[in-house]
């Protein structure tokens, strides 16, 4: 079981809600994934209508909702979005996202840290989306973040774990869960993240943009479980030279008789 804040999860696959062809397709993929934590951008909700055709079915499914502050350009906007989510959705959980550059969607480390500090002081359960920066992740942990969410590669790029070397350092040092977020484009990449010791992965585009999102969600669910089992089993050590599986000396002794 994975514990984040005051909640426990049996599934280590977290999912997003964007880019699906329809709400029905999203719900079917969500069910297939087995995910128990789903992130949703506050900017996508129709709060004036009093009913949202995306939010309502997600709540009915029983999964935990993780509102995110995607679209916020600075700490002030992100804090406002988080407070709005707590008031409207009744949750103090927030995925903190601040990316002022609309082209590359790179998270702003300074504004993210400043917002995280304020939100933690106000009683939020903060999961910040950040660069794979070990120092930043340690600092975010120190101000009270419940988990850290370093990127594997840019959002929606499907380029995989380009930051693998830094993710390994973050995982080694962290005292809170590490959720690899952004850029995971295939089940094998999700498995690789889990094999290196990530607590969980968050996947959206790779599922939603696939030809069959429901089948792809099943594939990701299996990959995450397998990757976690491999990590717990302990991967064999990597060597730079060949190491035979049979004793060579015994063979040469036999031939010389």
From Swiss-Prot:
Subcellular location, record wording = Cytoplasm
> Could you name the Gene Ontology cellular component terms for this entry?
cytoplasm
One Gene Ontology MF term: thiazole synthase activity
State where 1-deoxy-D-xylulose 5-phosphate binds.
Answer: 156, 182-183, 204-205
**Which pathway does it operate in?**
Cofactor biosynthesis; thiamine diphosphate biosynthesis
What this protein catalyses is: [ThiS sulfur-carrier protein]-C-terminal-Gly-aminoethanethioate + 2-iminoacetate + 1-deoxy-D-xylulose 5-phosphate = [ThiS sulfur-carrier protein]-C-terminal Gly-Gly + 2-[(2R,5Z)-2-carboxy-4-methylthiazol-5(2H)-ylidene]ethyl phosphate + 2 H2O + H(+)
Q: In the UniProt entry, which residues are flagged as the active site?
A: 95
Protein keywords:
Cytoplasm, Schiff base, Thiamine biosynthesis, Transferase
Q: State the EC number(s).
A: 2.8.1.10
BP terms from Gene Ontology: thiamine diphosphate biosynthetic process
Fetch the InterPro entries from UniProt: Aldolase_TIM (IPR013785), Thiazole_synthase_ThiG (IPR033983), ThiG (IPR008867)
**Assembly and interaction partners:** Homotetramer. Forms heterodimers with either ThiH or ThiS.
Q: Which family does it belong to?
A: Belongs to the ThiG family.
Q: What role does it play?
A: Catalyzes the rearrangement of 1-deoxy-D-xylulose 5-phosphate (DXP) to produce the thiazole phosphate moiety of thiamine. Sulfur is provided by the thiocarboxylate moiety of the carrier protein ThiS. In vitro, sulfur can be provided by H(2)S.
Q: Which PANTHER family does its entry note?
A: THIAZOLE SYNTHASE
Could you tell me what this protein is called? Thiazole synthase
Q: What is the lineage of its organism?
A: Bacteria, Pseudomonadati, Pseudomonadota, Gammaproteobacteria, Alteromonadales
């Amino acid at each position: 079981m994975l514990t984040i804040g005051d909640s426990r999860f049996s599934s280590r696959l977290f999912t997003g809600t964007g880019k699906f062809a329809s709400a029905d397709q999203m719900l079917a993929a969500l069910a297939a994934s087995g995910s128990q934590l789903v992130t949703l951008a506050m900017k996508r909700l129709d709060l004036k209508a009093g009913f949202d055709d995306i939010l309502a079915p997600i709540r009915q499914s029983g999964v935990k909702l993780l509102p995110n502050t995607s679209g916020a350009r600075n700490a002030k906007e992100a804090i406002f979005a988080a407070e709005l989510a707590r008031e409207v959705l009744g949750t103090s959980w927030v995925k903190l996202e601040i990316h002022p550059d609309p082209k590359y969607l790179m998270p702003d480390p300074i504004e993210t840290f400043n917002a995280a500090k304020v939100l933690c002081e106000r009683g939020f359960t903060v999961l910040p989306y950040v660069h794979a920066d070990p120092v930043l992740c340690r600092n975010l942990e120190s101000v009270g973040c419940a988990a850290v969410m370093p990127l594997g590669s840019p959002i929606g790029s499907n380029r995989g774990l380009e930051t693998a070397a830094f993710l390994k350092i973050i995982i080694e040092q962290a005292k809170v869960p590490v959720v690899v977020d952004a850029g995971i484009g295939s089940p094998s990449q999700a498995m690789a993240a889990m094999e290196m010791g990530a607590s969980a992965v968050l996947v959206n585009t790779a599922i939603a943009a696939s030809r069959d999102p429901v089948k792809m969600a099943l594939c990701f669910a299996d990959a995450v479980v397998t990757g976690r089992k491999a990590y717990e089993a302990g991967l064999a050590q990597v060597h730079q030279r060949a190491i035979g599986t049979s004793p060579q000396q015994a063979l040469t002794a036999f031939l010389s008789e």
